[in-house]
């Protein structure tokens, strides 16, 4: 496994309730617990949960993405408790070639963190960072048809539905939202 950062990197964002930071070694078990929840993973990729080894592989991929692009997915930590809630951040959506080139904003939170506005709060911080610090001019976000909670977050961010298409590697119908920054 690619070595995860052991301490906070200069690349972190803060909101009223959340710390968005680079991944740490200690995050593996907490993130594996999120990825083991069927209701969380229902609309992710092919809908299957991930075990600890699969989660470790994903975290290594997230680290490689940061190294290659200079941005990526942040671990979302609840400031009040120090708990890992999930992630939010930016990625290059190579799994959907028809929309490339693009930068996608995405999120995944454990079930215990749903319905509290945390995904929107975290994503708003990432949008501001993408615009103000990274100089990006456009973001997309993609959700599997049926994931209305993610669609609501996209709309709250100011995104508009751009197209519906099929994700080639899974055959699932997805909706692509976009916004100019």
Regions inferred by a protein language model and the residue ranges of each:
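Short loop/turn motifs at secondary-structure junctions and domain boundaries
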Residues: 65-69
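Conserved GNAT-fold acetyl-CoA-binding loop/helix
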Residues: 39-61, 72-74
């Amino acid at each position: 496994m690619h070595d995860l950062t052991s301490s906070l990197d200069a690349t972190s964002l803060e909101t009223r309730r959340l710390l968005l930071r680079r991944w740490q070694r200690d995050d593996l078990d907490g993130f594996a617990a999120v990825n083991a929840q069927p209701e969380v993973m229902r609309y992710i990729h092919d809908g299957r949960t991930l075990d600890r080894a699969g989660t470790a592989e994903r975290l290594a991929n997230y680290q490689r993405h940061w190294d290659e692009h200079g941005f990526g997915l942040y671990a979302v930590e609840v400031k009040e408790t120090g708990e890992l809630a999930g992630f939010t951040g930016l990625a290059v959506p190579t799994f959907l070639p028809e929309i490339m080139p693009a930068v996608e904003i995405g999120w995944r939170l454990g079930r215990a963190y749903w319905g509290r506005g945390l995904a929107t709060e975290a994503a708003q911080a990432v949008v501001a960072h993408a615009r103000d610090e990274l100089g990006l001019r456009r973001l997309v976000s993609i959700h599997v048809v049926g994931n209305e909670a993610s669609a609501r977050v996209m709309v709250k961010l100011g995104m508009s539905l751009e197209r519906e298409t099929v994700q080639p590697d899974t055959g699932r119908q997805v909706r692509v939202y976009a916004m100019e920054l």
